[in-house]
Amino acid sequence: MRNELKVTILQSDLFWENPDANRRMFSEKINNINENTDLIVLPEMFTTGFTMNASFLAESESGQTLDWMKIQANKKNSALVGSFIVSEKNNFYNRLFFVEPNGDYYTYDKRHTFTLANEHLTYTSGKELLTINFLGWKICPFICYDLRFPVWARNTCDYDLLIYIANWPQKRIHAWDTLLRARAIENMAYCVGVNRTGKDDNLNQYNGHSAIYDVLGKQLTTTKYEGNFYETIILEKTHIVSERAHFQFLSDRDHFTLN
C-alpha cells in the first residue's frame, strides 16, 4: 500500500466533435507532463466535447480511444481517467474509463444524465457505482452532473478519493466550486474535479476551475485556473486516516440503502 498518490489534473479546451484532433492534442499534453505521476485525469467526453451526436461519434468499448488510453498510460507509467461516447447493444453511454499502466481498465457509466440538455434522450444511465483499488488507494469516479447528487457518492468508508470529470459551464461554475468542496468535506475523502475550458458549438462557455480538495475541504491546487494547464498534487493516506480517526464524522452517519 502506498501512502502517497501523485495526481495530475489536466484542464484543456476541446476540439468540437473531433476525436482525432483531441487525441493528438492530449498526447502532446500528456507527454509534456514533466514530473512522475501516478494518475492523470482528463475532462468528460475528452474526445468530442459534450455532444448529443452519439450516433455519429460513438465507439465500441474496445475501439480507438481505449487503445490510445492504454498506450498513454503505459508510456507515462500512470493510470489515465477520462470519458468518451460508447455504443453497446443498441445503447449509447457516457462512459468513464480508468486505465492502468498495464492495460487493465475499469468503467463507470454516468448515472445522472443531464435532462436540461436532453442527455437522457440520447444516453442510457448507468446503474452501478465503481470503486477501484489502485496502489492501495480506493478510488470512486463520477461524471459531471453526478456531482449534484450527494447520496449517490455517499461514503460508508468505502473509498479514499473521489474523482469528478466534467464539461461544466461557466454560468454555473459557483455550483461546481461549492459542491466539489462539499463532497470532500461530507465524505472525509480527497476530491478531484477536472473541467474543460473554451467554447463549444452550442455556444456554451467553460472556464475550468479544476481543483483538488483534502478531507477538510482545503484546496490543494494553487488556484482556480481558467486557462489550459496541468498541476500535480501529492495526496497522503495518513492524512485521511488521522482526520477520520480524530473527528469520526463518518461513524455518525445515517444508515440506509439505495434501491
Regions found by a protein language model. Give the residues of each.
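Long hydrophobic alpha-helical segments typical of transmembrane helices together
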Residues: Y206-N259
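N-terminal active-site segment of His-dependent metallophosphoesterases
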Residues: M1-L39, I163
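Active-site catalytic loop in hydrolytic enzyme cores
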Residues: S87-C157, K171-T178, H239-L250
